[in-house]
Amino acid sequence: MASNIKIVFFGTGGSWPTPIRAMPGVGIQIDDVFNLFDCGEGTQKQIMKSKWSFMSIDNIFITHFHGDHFLGLIGLVQSMSFNNRTKDLNIFGPRGAIGIISNAINIGYYTLRFRINVYELEPDKTYDLGKFLLKTTLNDHPVPALSYTIEEKDIIRVDPQKAKELGIPSKIIEKIRDNGTYEYRGRKYSIDEISGGIRKGRKIVYTGDTKPMQKMADFAKHADVLIHDTTTDSSFEPAVNQFGHSSAKQAARIARDAGVSRLFLYHYSPRITDVSPLVDDARAEFQESYASEDLMEYEVKVKH
């Protein structure tokens, strides 16, 4: 069956927190698997304002180790311990993650009550994480930094007429789809016997901080959702590019070239209070551009 995929923007600002925006943190829930992308200062408090529980987080993916993207880990991990978490927590990041995260989670006096598994990921790799595939690429930022893609695995469509002709009930169809074959009433059925083609899995791309780069358009090709660094409007492009960031117009060009379904503007400069000029800039290049806001939720619908 198709998974339920939801995105929650816990924080959409960059550099430092403001009264209207929290630091970067994006939740992507795939059924009962909770993934957090970046964990800036105050992320746990933002999670408390949402429908999520910070105790349910399974995986945390850090794009890079500038403070606005990971300093929230310190408080989050300690709060998990105070609340008697026992299940493992997986934390992923670019080169240097093991040392930096080890230092962060060992600040201060507390008892760590659960196992933390830290993984350093290589760029341009694909990792099978069960419910989904995680893909990485090196982006253009002054420090080691990765962009991530979550890809739902392709799903085999079932032809109901074929299943009906074979006398296979719906509960058995799912077992055949999950296992490839399944024995029912003394006969082994194959998925090929009831297949109606392939439904491509949904794809979400989270860039983290990056200058615009053509490689990102290839990385985000035909994504359902692209969440791209849009630090400012086009009038400040030279300045933000110098520090490894993108403007809204540049992000929209990437979205257009990639052929994505929807672009979310993200990681606004703390000097920006009104994002409407950024949306206008972006929509001049790519109409399906939208401003993300703190605690906004978005459901990624199934492709038909």
From Swiss-Prot:
It catalyses: Endonucleolytic cleavage of RNA, removing extra 3' nucleotides from tRNA precursor, generating 3' termini of tRNAs. A 3'-hydroxy group is left at the tRNA terminus and a 5'-phosphoryl group is left at the trailer molecule. Zn(2+) 1 binds at H64, H66, H141, D209. It comes from the Archaea. Its cofactor is Zn(2+). GO terms for molecular function: 3'-tRNA processing endoribonuclease activity; zinc ion binding. Zn(2+) 2 binds at D68, H69, D209, H267. The keyword Metal-binding applies. Binds 2 Zn(2+) ions. Gene3D superfamilies: Ribonuclease Z/Hydroxyacylglutathione hydrolase-like. It is an enzyme of class 3 (hydrolase). The active site is at D68 (proton acceptor). Its EC number is 3.1.26.11. Keywords: Endonuclease, Hydrolase, Metal-binding, Nuclease, tRNA processing, Zinc. Homodimer. NCBIfam families: PRK00055.1-3 (NF000801), RNase_Z (TIGR02651). Belongs to the RNase Z family. Zinc phosphodiesterase, which displays some tRNA 3'-processing endonuclease activity. Probably involved in tRNA maturation, by removing a 3'-trailer from precursor tRNA. HAMAP family: RNase_Z_BN. This is Ribonuclease Z. It comes from Thermoplasma volcanium (strain ATCC 51530 / DSM 4299 / JCM 9571 / NBRC 15438 / GSS1). The gene is rnz.
